[in-house]
Each structure stands twice: as C-alpha cells, then as structure tokens.
C-alpha cells in the first residue's frame, strides 16, 4: 500500500530541518423560536450563502467554515471523539493496554482515529495522538503510569538541563506522518483530517513539573526565579512545534488545532507574557509555509482571554462551554471563525434537550464561520447514542431554514451585499 504524500498545502518542499537553533546549547433554557443572537453583520450573508455554496472548491466543509466561507450548514466534530466512551475502543484497549502503543503504532492510530468516522460520520477526523507524543523526538523521554498519567523522570529546570534537548527528529515520528497519509486517503474529501499540537506553555508545564499538576507552582515560580531558562525552553519548544505542525500538514492534515490546555491557569497578563508570543510565532511561521492551512486555537477556561487569543492570528478560536456563544461572537468580531461550544454534559441529557442546545449554539454563532463542537472533550461514559444524535442533528441543520425569518430586506443594508 503506497504512502505517497497528498498534495501539500505548504509552500516549502520539505520540513525535516535538523538545524533548529535555540538560546541555550531548547444548563440551558429551551429555544425560543424567535431567538436570534447572531450579530447583525451576518444577516445578509445568511441570505446570500447559496451563491457561495456553488463554489467548485474541493475543500471539505470544515475547512470552508474555518476559512469563513459561506456554506449550507455548520460542520461538526468532537474533541476526544475517538476514545474511551466507545465500546470498540474499549475492546481494542484490552488487547493493547499501553496508551503509548495505541498512540505510536500506525495501524492502531488509524484504526482508532477511524472508529468515530465509521460510526458517526463527523465532518472532521482527528488523528489519535497526544500533545506529548513528540517529546522524545527532541530529547524528553516520558512514561505514562496508570494512576499518575504522564511522568517525566528528568524535568528541565536549569541551564544544564537544557543541554539534553536537541532539534526535533522526524524519524522518531514516522508513525504520525504515515497515519495522516492513510487517514487522508481513507476519508478522501468527505471530511477534514485534523492534526494537533500542544502550545509551548502547556508542553512546558509537563517538562518542568515532571508530569501533571494541580498547582503549577514550579513553572510559575520559574517565571520569576529562572526566567531566562524558561524563555529558552519555550523558544526551543516553539521551533520544534512549528516544524511538527508543518510536518503534519505535509503528510495530510487539512487543519491544525493548537491546544493551550493549561494556558487558562495563568492570569491574562502572565499568559500575554509567557504563552501568547510563542503561539504567535508558531502561527506566523506556519502561515508563511502553509498559507492555506487553517489553524484552530483552543484554551480550556478561555473566557477572560478571547480578545488576546484573537491577537495570535489563529483562523478559528475554540470556545469552551463556559463562554456564551453570542457574547464570544460579539467580542471576537467577524474576522475569525469560532468553534464550539456545547457543554459535554448535554450528551447525558434527554435527546430533545441536546437538540435544543445544539440549535441554540448554532443560532448564536450565526450562519458563517462556525465549526460545531463541544466546549471540551467527550466525557468518559458518554452514551454513543447521544454522540450519534449530535452528528445527525448537525447534518440536518440548514442555515437558510434556521435564519430565513430573521434576515432583513436587502434594501436595509445594501452595502453588505456580497
């Protein structure tokens, strides 16, 4: 079976540079039928979307939404859509109990990634992986213990520790590239293949703390006691993650999501200093090399950071479920697309309540530039019936029907006609 590379969205021919340098030696109310909470600027676009939908572009629906193009319905996928809530995954995990094996073996990665695609037909198929997967490729070995989770035996906290790091070695990540190629071929243009990375700050929390933590006291203290070392680490991570993003795109990813999972643990001012500049650098570099690849940016607990997140240059801002979608749209404006943000707990609710919440979120997001998703990952124990209903509801949505009663006459705003 050939693993020939799909058409690259990147302007560079190859992205395997080994010459990386670094500073040192690396609960909702039922819908009111009359409710309209999308911003007024979308009203004409809602009525005019039919014209743009005749475009000959071969981009999957999710990519079009990420780019803010007019489409007929919101595309849908779920964070953690492949995983422990699915019976087929549980059966496979019994045969292959090591998470590292499941996420670092091409055959298993492809099989697990395709499980929700085969069951529910989402509009996005995300590679089954982990934000820590690339760490050994640049000098940070780690283990995953059943109770403690990821464990890094030798944290990086000093200038001497930094010498253990090296440029990212893609020979150690071939399983990622091969898996993306196969996924791209398997789903064709029927769905977008999504790759993902962790943001430098979030990855650094594991490397500095030595694993997961509830307090982040060690790395937060480093901001004041060893800022040069922390900056050097973040700079090294930024270069490695940039190359890893481009590697994923060149091997088939239509779209990339950046997870700053623990960025919300910082004050807005500290996030502006210790996370945002490095994310901006990644996005700027990727946009130069892969200008047609949309980048989604998500922070858990991002209600106080939306405007700052927009400033990174990401194409799509993911909202967690604690953010009101209408308020998020108002604060972000029409220049970026949004993703989200159904509360994952709604998947445990009666199906009619789930339907109402999906419709409410879609109405608040407006008829353009919205990727329907949860506000966080799928929870363990989520009924598969509810996941199936989520995607079926999304497929049956139609912007023209949802917004037809709320579009003012063209004469009211002729300057907005496109």
From Swiss-Prot:
Q: Where in the cell is it found?
A: Plastid, Chloroplast
First-listed, main subcellular location of the protein, grouped into a coarse class: plastid
State what induces this protein: Up-regulated by light. Not regulated by circadian rhythm.
Q: Which reaction does it catalyse?
A: uroporphyrinogen III + 4 H(+) = coproporphyrinogen III + 4 CO2
Question: Which segment is the transit peptide?
Answer: 1-53
Question: Which class of enzymes does this protein belong to?
Answer: lyase
List the Gene Ontology MF annotations in alphabetical order. Answer: uroporphyrinogen decarboxylase activity
What PANTHER family does this protein's entry cite?
A: METHYLTETRAHYDROFOLATE:HOMOCYSTEINE METHYLTRANSFERASE RELATED (PTHR21091), UROPORPHYRINOGEN DECARBOXYLASE 1, CHLOROPLASTIC (PTHR21091:SF167)
What does the annotation say about its assembly with partners? Homodimer.
Record's function text: Catalyzes the decarboxylation of four acetate groups of uroporphyrinogen-III to yield coproporphyrinogen-III.
**Which named protein is this?**
Uroporphyrinogen decarboxylase 1, chloroplastic
Q: Which organism is it from?
A: Arabidopsis thaliana (Mouse-ear cress)
């Amino acid at each position: 079976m050939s693993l020939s590379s799909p058409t690259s969205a990147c302007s560079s021919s190859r992205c395997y540079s080994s010459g990386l340098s670094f500073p040192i030696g690396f609960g909702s109310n039922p819908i009111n039928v009359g409710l309209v909470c999308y911003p007024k600027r979308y009203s004409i676009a809602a009525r005019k979307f039919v014209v743009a939908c005749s475009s000959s572009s071969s981009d999957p629906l999710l990519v079009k939404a990420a780019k803010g193009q007019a489409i007929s319905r919101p595309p849908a996928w779920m964070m953690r859509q492949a995983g422990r809530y699915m019976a087929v995954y549980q059966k496979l995990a019994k045969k292959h109990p090591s998470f590292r094996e499941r996420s670092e073996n091409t055959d298993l990665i492809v099989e697990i990634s395709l499980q929700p695609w085969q069951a529910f037909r989402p509009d996005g198929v995300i590679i089954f992986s982990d934000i820590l997967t690339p760490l050994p490729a640049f000098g940070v070995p780690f283990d995953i213990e059943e109770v403690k989770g990821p464990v890094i035996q030798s944290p990086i906290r000093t200038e001497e520790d930094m010498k253990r790091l090296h440029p990212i070695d893609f020979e150690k990540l071939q399983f990622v590239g091969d898996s993306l190629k196969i996924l791209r071929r398997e789903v064709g243009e029927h769905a977008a293949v999504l790759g993902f990375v962790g943001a430098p700050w979030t990855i650094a929390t594991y490397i500095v703390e030595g694993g997961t933590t509830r307090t982040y006291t060690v790395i937060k203290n480093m901001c004041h006691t060893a800022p040069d070392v922390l900056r050097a680490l973040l700079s090294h991570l930024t270069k490695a993650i940039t190359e890893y993003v481009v590697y994923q795109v060149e091997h088939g990813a239509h779209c990339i999501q950046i997870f700053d999972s623990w960025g919300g643990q910082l004050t807005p001012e500290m996030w502006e200093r210790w996370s945002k500049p490095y994310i901006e650098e990644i996005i700027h570099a990727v946009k130069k090399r892969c200008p047609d690849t949309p980048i989604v940016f998500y922070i858990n607990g991002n209600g106080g950071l939306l405007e700052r997140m927009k400033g990174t240059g990401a194409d799509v801002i993911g909202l967690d479920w604690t953010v009101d979608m209408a308020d998020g749209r108002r604060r972000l404006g029409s220049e970026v697309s949004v993703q989200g943000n159904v509360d994952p707990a709604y998947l445990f609710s009666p199906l009619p309540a789930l339907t109402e919440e999906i419709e409410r979120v879609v109405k608040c997001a407006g008829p353009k530039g919205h990727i329907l998703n949860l506000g966080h990952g799928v929870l363990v124990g989520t009924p598969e019936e509810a996941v199936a209903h989520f995607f079926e509801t999304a497929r049956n949505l139609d912007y023209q029907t949802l917004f037809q009663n709320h579009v003012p006459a063209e004469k009211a705003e002729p300057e907005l006609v496109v």
